[in-house]
């Protein structure tokens, strides 16, 4: 396979007089420009593209034009971000200044493919592997505030790139847009589920096992009938529970409700099965979370849209999936609640660092999650203490030159880290200001101060890291229903360890089913409205760190997404951390005595 690719690089397209007809190019151009990049092409611009493809690809245009058109579309999106219509006057300079001709494009792919298929790559030493991974295509950390913002177009049922840049001081309409986006993402996901797809031929075919959603506005005049609704749980000022969708709302009677597996609180999007009463109430029989959709199914539904702004197409991702098999032993070490104002923290950290310093294979990266102070950071009086904590950490790290040289350190802020207002921080949260960590940067060769949440891209794997004490927030705000689910024993009769595992599974299922890291109303969990998309869990990540210091360590696999939490570093007389292997989706929890 390598020889054929090399040949295609060395042999340039034949420079013969060949003309591609616009009508012949139209299907490919439509697929690339319209379906993939949401751009519209008029007749003149299609003619210009056909002429350009004729010159670059010649008689081999059918097999070679798609990568070329992809590069042109990417360049257009970068240069004319707010112009969705590709016009000929603007297209001509784009084609003239295109710096990535087709043969170079193939060469870059060939290089990746050669890396992944040759034995020298698969059998290379650790040092050679790290040198290769330095390329940003293989490893990068995505900041929540630098991700592209996509809006959901409900009429076309597609995501489109927002023309307006998000701001910290968003208008009131941003709150409405935020809720609409959450609703439509989950609603479209439900409709793709086979249980909600009505057979094309009804007649003699049984429809057992399929469900149909009813808009709330359609309940009027249909008292006494049973319906399945979908909407947002809200609490009215008088304390009553309501269900809202995009058009209407209805008050719920949950006195006889049987809840499904998971946690339910105001702000959650739920499926409700029940009967509409003549009094205007909706008597709930069952209440549950939307069905989950696996990552590959979501990516297929999005037509492999580059929703994270990685600038990699499906072919490149396929090559990376093959290449990453050589890195199954590469580990991410995750440590949480690293209080730098506690001397025992440094004792535990040095024990962990020494373990890896003396081993042959050091971790690929070490993720240190806050809070980095045991009390909330205040604008007055905390700055000196906060910086001294990181200076002490830098002094401690100097004892371990091997990991400082070869391991990447990622710092994720927690609830007590700057900046907070009366101990409350908005989500997403900016990275730790560099003023406090300049000594860390001098000691460690590779340091990344990430936002909260952040996404770590490792080859084709997406590892989502979110630091929040979310389990306690769910416990404080969860709703109580009239009936206990069938088959559920008295909670007091279950051992404490099993209760914790049960709650952890509920937590993971709820977050992934909701496709959002913070399914709470703004009064419960304040959010920057214009950046709410950064908290979305759609499509599912390859792996997710739900870092919660109030919960014990766990490792839960659900929907094809391994979810982990190392718990607090210090817990009683033990210190805890986890090793995550993103390629083989394996998680190892460590617990050792101080």
UniProtKB/Swiss-Prot annotation:
- The signal peptide here is none
Covalent S-S links between cysteines: none
User: Some GO term, biological process aspect, for this entry: which one?
Assistant: DNA strand elongation involved in mitotic DNA replication
Location in or out of the cell: Nucleus
- Gene Ontology molecular functions: DNA binding
Please give the Pfam families that the UniProt record associates with this protein: DNA_pol_E_B
Primary location class: nucleus
What other facts are recorded?
In eukaryotes there are five DNA polymerases: alpha, beta, gamma, delta, and epsilon which are responsible for different reactions of DNA synthesis.
Q: What is the name attached to this protein's record? A: DNA polymerase epsilon subunit B
Query: Which gene is annotated as encoding this protein in its UniProt record?
Result: dpb2
